[in-house]
Amino acid sequence: MSCKIEKSELSGHIVCPPNKSYSHRAIFLASLAGNNSKIDNVLFSADTIATIEACRKFGAEIEEDSTSLVVKNSIKMNKIVPEIDAKNSGTTIRIASGIASLFTKEITLTGDSSLQKRPMKPLLDALESIGAKCVSTNGMPPIKITGKILGGEVSIPGNFSSQFISSLLICAPLTEKGISLNIKENLVSKPYIDATIATMRNFGVGVQTFIPYKKYYISPQIYKSTTFTVPIDFSSLAILLSASVLNGKNFVIHGNIGNLPQGDEVFIDILEQLGVKVSVDEEQITVQSPEKLNGGRFDLSNSPDLLPPLAILAMKTINPIEIVNVKHARLKETDRISILARELAKIGIKTQEKEDGLILESSNGFRGASLNSENDHRLFMVFCIAGMYLGDCTVTDHESVAVSYPNFITEMNKFGAKITIQ
């Protein structure tokens, strides 16, 4: 279904959603630890619910309320249900694949039509190199995995997805030998590896770093029960900040920022480079935006989810925005580079599509348009924000926001947006 968006102004105090990446990691690690491990401020979205259900299929006993969950009992071999549906969640299927390789039972992992187009081969090859049997068609889901991996030395390319490395890191301490992990090529999305290691540390497991983002060793260890509080999601915060830059008036964003590493926090630096004044207190963020932004060249190799919220700011820049080193954004839920180039051109932004990014330039010919988000949650949200700036826009596939920000439309309308589901 589509939404109609009219020109809007946002004001008031909004709460930023909890972090999706940390919610995923904490749910998996709490399920490996068990013993009443608790996660506070967890994000309940389609993707994280897929992770909760995957852990239940692995045998974990999980209780949840509106903002938290408790894992009573951990993942157990004798309770495993041998088929896991990760829905649309790449993080779920990739981390679950590593966990599946720890067991001798054959486990099938699959997902929706979009997930079945996302690459898994580098991870499957790595798991097979240490003893797993992995069966797939062209290295994509559905896949069948049979363990048991024993550990040892593993090499894996880092230029496809950091989720492959996170999967190996998480399963490594539960192997007999531990894992010596060698990352080939240039690693993309480095901060997500930092997030994985930080979450593991919170659950009592240490990772020895020999060369950052290149060589790690994880000895045999046991995950320990703990209480973990999920911080705000800087990926969602970036979208709210772009909304504030384009459409905000006394718009205040609240949330527990915390001190865990998040690569997307660089968006604050990006906004300041563009000429936006950003004020960050312990639990609230506000922006003061000039009438026109500066433009500039931005390397998003470590923060691919910032591509959509940065791209739409080209509507307000004096000079072009050039986004580079984000080729891996083509391997997200959609080819975000191609879709942004195509759809932003409809509203009058001058777009040049590059293999690894975009060059975006403002124009005098902005206009409303019908925008196709291709069921990508982040594209839907930023196209709505563009619609608030321009007026007279429609955007397809509003259901996609269930993946990361289920209340997006309700929240935006509460604070002044004019978004109508058609």
Model regions: which residues?
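Short, structured segments at the rim of ligand-binding sites
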Residues: 1-422
